[in-house]
Amino acid sequence: TLLASSAASDVYKRQIEDTSWIRPVKYVGVWWEMITGKSDWAYTRDVPSVQLGVTDYAATKPSGRHAANNDNVRRYIDFAAEHGFDQVLVEGWNVGWEDWFGHTKDYVFDFVTPYPDFDIAALNDYARQKGVRLMMHHETSSSVRNYERHLEAAYGLMNRYGYNAVKSGYVGDILPRGEYHYGQWMVNHYLHAVKLAAKHHIMVNAHEAVRPTGLCRTWPNLIGNESARGTEYQAFGGTKPIHVTLLPFTRLQGGPMDYTPGIFSMDVSKLNPENHSH
C-alpha cells in the first residue's frame, strides 16, 4: 500500500553509517506565547534598527516582554523534566530580533550572540541537571547567504554548549532577491545545511523549507520538516478536518513532519487578551 511504501526514500543512498546519535525527540518551547502576542522575540523596543556588533543592548531598556529570559526558560525546562519531554526550544535567544522581519536585511543575525538576559552556558547546564537539553533555534529571516556565512560558527557554538538539534526557519522573501523557497538554489542550500550539520552531529528540523522528497534516507539527521500546515493553524482560522487525514498520503510520503502537536487551547485570548484570533 501507499502508506507502507518506502519507495521515495529507497532511491537514496545512505551517507551516514553511524546513526546512533540520531533519534527523534519530543520538545516544548516558548514560541506559542510569542506568536500569540503575550511576549516578544525581541529584547527591547528602544532600537528600531540593529547593528550587530555595534548596538549595545546593555545600554537599552528591556521591554519586559522578552520570552527567552533565564527565569522563563528555567520554567520550561522544569516542565519538560517533569512531564517527560526531551528538549526545550528557545526562540528569540540571540540578538537581532528587533528588526528581523520585513526589512530585506542581509546581516540580520549572527547566530552566536545571546541577549543579555539569556545565559547560554548556565541554562544548558541547568537543563542537563534536569535530564533534558535545550534545542537551538536558527531563524534566518530568509537571509540565506548571511546564514551560510555564519553556519560553521553557529554549529560550533552548538557543539560547545551541548546542543544536538536545531530548528531552522526561513520566514519572509528569500535573499538574494530572485530566489525562492522551493527553487533549485534554495534546495542546494537546504542540502548544504543538513550535510554540514551531519559533520557536527546535529539534527535539523527545518521550517518553511522545501517539502521533503526522501532525502532523510541519505541524511537521516534531517529529523523533520514543517512543509505543511501544522497544529497552530487550528487557532489561526483553522484547517479543514480532512487536512490531517490527507497528510499520510501526501506530505508525509516524502519524509517526517514536525506537525507541532500539543497545542490544546485554541483560544489564544487566554494568553493574550488582546488577541482574538480563535
Residues of each region from the PLM?
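Phosphate/adenylate-binding glycine loop and adjacent helical scaffold
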Residues: R23
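Catalytic domains of carbohydrate-active enzymes, especially glycoside hydrolases
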Residues: N72-W93, R160-N164
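Active-site mouth loops of central-metabolism enzymes
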Residues: M34-R45, G53-N72, H137-H150
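Conserved hydrophobic/aromatic pocket- or pore-lining residues that grip, position, or stack substrates
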Residues: V28, A80, A127
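GHKL-family ATPase ATP-binding module
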Residues: R14-I16
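Aromatic- and carboxylate-enriched substrate-binding clefts and catalytic-loop regions
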Residues: E91-H276
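Single conserved hydrophobic/aromatic residue that forms the stacking wall/gate
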Residues: L2-A4, A8, Y12
